[in-house]
Amino acid sequence: MSSIVRNSDDDPLVIAIQQPRIAIESVSPVVEEGAYPAKTESDRDLRLAARIFADGHEVLGAEVVWRRVGETAERRLPLLPEGNDFWSAQLRTPPCGRLYFRIEAWIDRFAGYRRELRAKHGARLPLDLELREGDELLQRCAERGGPEIAAACAPLAERLQACQSVEERVALWLAAQTGELLRLVGPREHLVRSREYPVEVERPLARFASWYELFPRSESGDPTRHGTFDDVIRRLPQIAAMGFDVLYFPPIHPIGRTHRKGRNNSLRAEAGDPGSPYAIGSEEGGHEAIHPELGDREDFRRLLVAVREHGMELALDFAIQCSPDHPWLREHPGWFAWRPDGSLRYAENPPKKYEDIVNVDFYAEQALPSLWEALRDVVLGWVEQGVTLFRVDNPHTKPLPFWEWLIAEVRGRHPQVIFLSEAFTRPAMMARLGKVGFSQSYTYFTWRNDKQELAEYFAELNQPPWRDCYRPNFFVNTPDINPWFLQRSGRPGFLIRAALATMGSGLWGMYSGFELCEAAALPGKEEYLDSEKYQLRPRDYQAPGNIVAEIARLNRIRRENPALQTHLGFQAYNAWNDRILYFGKRTADLANFVLVAVCLDPHEAQEAHFELPLWEFGLPDDASLQGEDLMNGHRWVWHGKVQWMRIEPWHLPFGIWRVRRVDA
């Protein structure tokens, strides 16, 4: 027989022999195979999982190996089998920053040996040969593992030799302490490693927060006087009493005068019209400056302190757009795309036009890299002032590589900074913004109104890829969006949307005036009449018909129920009425389980039979659950799976019930 010389570089047999015997699949949480980090928050249990299997009946061992960015020291967690080849571990997440993990798996000879020994011992089979095999396995481990392994194995070998009976030796081999020792020192045959996957750890505020937006210039209480930061400070107790965590301002910078907009977006401003705060920049300064009528740096610092004293944080608007008066046009004309006649094209976001705004050109020859660095420095400058939350205006109209770079630059130095994406655009772009680093995002929730589309949207956000890269912030309105539903639904409609937002996601927001049920619209448009973007709008926040108390109660319910502090865990349940959305949110251990029923009809009472999710507690259909109405504190016991409800929207268009086992 002639011998064949094989080239190991391209021989299929050699390549096959070198392939891993163990398969690692379906690793989670993973975004695009590790191209982008999955999202999580500090000080929580993060489930790391994978499907791991091999041929035959070999017993496998597996671990998660993880490290923090910038560290070389690795930490290990054992993965435990869940069934159907899935393995998982719970990692208590570290403080903010990037971490990396991989999965390692191997054939665990000692675990296989102990399993076989236990089975044969239980069947009362002769074990002399098996015990000799165990001794040889331990000896090989000591000989091949080096001095430290040999030293660790020696006490076990001595104890086995000292055993006086087969039963004693079997008991020692099967002892839990022996199993733990062998897990640590045993050979890891056919060891295979997954690639390394990134996870971005952010503050809990990135997942759970209630945002309140106001224009500080309207807080004077006088339609003829521009508001100040001190006026906002006087308002803080009211906002904090409603349970908000974040106070968010539109841009607070100087406003241009060229092409300044008048009331209701008029192309002509009258004397005294303040203009749109999004037309940033004048002779008083640009993105780094404060509008002089709001106050100065010292006033701003005093505001930041007051906001924190009321248990909130301040978020600023980062809008990359300039008025024609912005200092950058004089200082850096090469950052802009000039037309042949020497003019600049005004900004557009169809169908909207912004004649008072011009845009920078990110890829202009003179803008690379100085414009990018200047914008980064704007953000870092406000971080140095104490701002760690930024709502970013229309990020989908700026380059994705810019955002990925800027967010990494900022969070690399200040990992506590949170970025909210205000992008109402195509789903792929919204998801991609989350992947490149935005902590959270505005959503399509604003336009989801009927039962099917709400249930489908909430469920979609719980599934990949959204689940791991996108945190939805359910804003019920914005200065730009006066939703059709609110324009024609009256006070009950505002309560409906508040309930859906607060119960549907850990993140929700509202623009001031929502608590007063403001809905006057420009005819035929989803915009506010007398928009605050173009004029001062002082309000009576205690006006009759307000929903301040209900908002405060909803926010309190969120704080008291961990299941409601995330958009994850949504599960729709049966309620046999197309105008009632009925769903549940729960923690993994069922310690907190909240049911929510929302009447989607703001005008008519609705009734429905509905199912108590007894099966979620492992209970039969005739079992009972304790119920507690979280809006009024009433308690009772429900008996049986099918129940009945009636919701009258003029009283309260929703019900929120915490349920638990009767024997809990």
Swiss-Prot record:
Catalysed reactions, as listed in the record: alpha-maltose 1-phosphate + [(1->4)-alpha-D-glucosyl](n) = [(1->4)-alpha-D-glucosyl](n+2) + phosphate
GO process terms (BP): alpha-glucan biosynthetic process; oligosaccharide catabolic process
Keywords, sorted A to Z: Carbohydrate metabolism, Glycosyltransferase, Transferase
InterPro entries per UniProt: GlgE (IPR026585), GLGE_C (IPR049171), GlgE_dom_N/S (IPR021828), Glyco_hydro_13_cat_dom (IPR006047), Glyco_hydro_b (IPR013780), Glycoside_hydrolase_SF (IPR017853), Ig-like_fold (IPR013783)
Record-marked site positions (Transition state stabilizer): 480
Name of a matching Pfam family: Alpha-amylase
EC number: 2.4.99.16
Active site: 393 (nucleophile), 422 (proton donor)
Residues that bind alpha-maltose 1-phosphate: 261, 321, 356, 394, 533-534
EC class name: transferase
Signal peptide: none
An MF annotation (GO) of this entry: hexosyltransferase activity
Family membership: Belongs to the glycosyl hydrolase 13 family. GlgE subfamily.
Stated role: Maltosyltransferase that uses maltose 1-phosphate (M1P) as the sugar donor to elongate linear or branched alpha-(1->4)-glucans. Is involved in a branched alpha-glucan biosynthetic pathway from trehalose, together with TreS, Mak and GlgB.
Oligomeric and partner information: Homodimer.
Protein name per its UniProtKB record: Alpha-1,4-glucan:maltose-1-phosphate maltosyltransferase
Biological classification of the source: Bacteria, Pseudomonadati, Pseudomonadota, Gammaproteobacteria, Pseudomonadales
Gene, per the UniProt record: glgE
